[in-house]
Amino acid sequence: MSHRPGHEILTSVKAIVTVMPKPSVLDPQGAATAEAMKHLGLEETGRVRVGKSIEIELSGDANEDKLHEIARDLLSNPVIEDYRLEIVK
């Protein structure tokens, strides 16, 4: 069976999924963090966005497409969030 580059079947994989609010979505937690930073004396604080980072370790027949499916359908809300997938090993 041939595979496209970047879509190899992996026997064990560790990946980090970073989920962030889309730029067009209000981020009240980011705004509150920016305001708190100003109270700490960081007056020149720019825009702050708050997201989450999820580390996944899978064994068995995992592939990059499956990891994207997990990130898109389980770990993020594609209506209001973007995700980035980084395969670590």
What does each model-found stretch correspond to?
Residues 1-89:
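Non-catalytic terminal accessory/regulatory regions of metabolic enzymes
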